[in-house]
């Protein structure tokens, strides 16, 4: 189901005019793709606890969780986070019903080395990234979900599964603004508003810094930018 939602949501963001931006050539000044990939099996070395503490005083009850996938080809979907209770709750519409769930504080890394955004099929990594992480209009979303549903059926998924995935995908992408462009990091960067994750493009790959320490998103973004810069500094 996660794969289906990813595909559906990627289609919902890919409409609109094609970008004419050129890829940045001098990537050594803003991050090194090869170096980033070298850390795909050691997220905790790419952003170690002592570096996080330079920018944020983690409480004693913060717990580290490293979700390490055994399959080598899936390390770009690993997660490494420090979490602790916040007392906050978030609301989410899921399958037509509104649900409330705990929203703990968290700081860490996700999806280091991911190139999922390249499924856009555009000429350059930057164009793919901008096409994948963009705010689509309601009309674009509806057309994209229709196209994605047809492709899922072509791949052999049954109608009920496609209907469920489409419904969930529409719920998750219901807000008009779900991405916020962030300047000055990597070749491009975007804040994923719902997920509280800063995704940074480096060459043909990316990494995500997850930060949720406040209801004020500007505080979350400010810390995420500092931690992302630490990653880029390590991989100059």
Question: Where is each model-derived feature located?
Answer:
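Short, solvent-exposed recognition patches
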Residues: 59-184
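Bacterial signal peptide processing site
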Residues: 15-18
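Sec-dependent signal peptide recognition
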Residues: 1-7
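A short, solvent-exposed beta-edge/loop patch
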Residues: 151, 155-236
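C-terminal motif of bacterial Sec signal peptides marking the signal peptidase cleavage site
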Residues: 10-13
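Generic structural signal for hydrophobic residues
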Residues: 47-48, 52, 227
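Sec/Tat-exported extracytoplasmic proteins
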Residues: 51, 56-60, 231-236
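N-terminal low-complexity, Pro/Thr/Ser-rich intrinsically disordered segments
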Residues: 20-43, 50
């Amino acid at each position: 189901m996660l794969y289906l939602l990813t595909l559906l949501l990627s289609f919902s963001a890919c409409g609109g005019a094609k970008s004419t931006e050129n890829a940045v050539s001098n990537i050594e000044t803003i991050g090194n793709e090869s170096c980033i990939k070298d850390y795909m099996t050691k997220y905790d070395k790419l952003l170690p606890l002592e570096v996080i503490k330079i920018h944020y005083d983690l409480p004693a009850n913060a717990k580290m969780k490293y979700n390490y996938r055994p399959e080598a080809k899936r390390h770009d979907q690993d997660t490494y986070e420090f979490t602790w209770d916040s007392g906050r709750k978030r609301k989410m519409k899921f399958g037509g019903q509104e649900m409330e769930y705990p929203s703990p504080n968290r700081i860490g890394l996700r999806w280091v080395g991911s190139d999922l955004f390249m499924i856009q099929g555009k000429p350059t990594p930057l164009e793919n990234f901008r096409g994948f992480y963009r705010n689509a209009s309601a009309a674009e979303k509806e057309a994209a979900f229709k196209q994605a549903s047809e492709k899922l059926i072509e791949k052999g998924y049954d109608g009920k599964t496609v209907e469920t995935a489409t419904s969930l995908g529409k719920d998750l992408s219901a807000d008009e603004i779900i991405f916020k462009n962030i300047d000055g990091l990597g070749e491009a960067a975007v804040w994923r508003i719902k997920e509280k994750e800063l995704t940074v493009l480096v060459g043909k790959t990316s990494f995500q810094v997850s930060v949720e320490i406040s209801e004020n998103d500007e505080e979350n973004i400010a810390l995420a930018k500092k931690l992302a810069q630490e990653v880029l500094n390590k991989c100059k």
